[in-house]
C-alpha cells in the first residue's frame, strides 16, 4: 500500500481502500515504514465494496481489473476521473464482481502462464500511467 499511496500522490489520484484490509494503517505503522508523504495522500476508506460502489456518482466511469478478464487493458478508452478498481493482493476481484461488471473488466496481458499475477502495486502503476497516456498528459 505504501507504493500505491506514493503512486496516487504522484498522479494526484485518490486512494480508496475497501475493508476488511489485509494490513494495518496506523500513524505508528506509517511512520515506521518511512511513509513521510502519507499525510498528504487523499485516502478514503469504505466498509465494503457495495458501500464504495453505492457512493459513486451515477455517471461514474468504473474500470475493473482481473487476471480472469477476457479483454486486454489496451482495449479500454479511459475517461478523466475514471475509478480504477483492483482486488486484494492475494485473491484479486471476486467472481461475482467480475461477472456483474464483465463489460468493464480488463486484464493486463501476461505472456508466461507460470506467473499467476503481477504485484498489485505494479499492476496499479501500469494501469494509472496507461490512463494518463491516453488522456494526453
Where are these regions (language model features)?
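Post-transcriptional modification and biogenesis factors for structured RNAs
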Residues: 1-137
Amino acid at each position: 500500500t505504501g507504493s500505491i499511496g506514493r503512486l496516487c500522490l504522484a498522479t494526484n489520484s485518490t486512494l480508496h481502500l475497501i475493508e476488511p484490509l489485509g494490513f494495518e494503517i496506523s500513524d505508528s505503522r506509517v511512520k515506521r515504514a518511512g511513509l513521510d508523504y502519507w499525510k498528504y495522500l487523499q485516502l478514503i476508506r469504505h466498509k465494503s465494496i457495495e458501500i464504495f460502489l453505492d457512493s459513486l456518482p451515477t455517471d461514474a466511469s468504473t474500470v475493473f481489473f482481473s487476471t480472469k478478464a477476457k479483454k486486454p487493458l489496451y482495449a479500454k478508452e479511459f475517461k478523466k476521473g475514471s475509478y480504477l478498481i483492483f482486488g486484494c493482493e492475494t485473491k484479486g476481484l471476486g467472481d461475482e464482481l467480475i461477472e456483474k461488471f464483465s463489460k468493464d473488466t480488463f486484464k493486463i496481458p501476461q505472456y508466461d502462464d507460470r506467473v499467476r499475477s503481477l504485484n498489485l502495486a505494479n499492476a496499479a502503476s501500469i494501469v494509472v500511467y496507461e490512463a494518463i497516456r491516453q488522456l494526453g498528459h
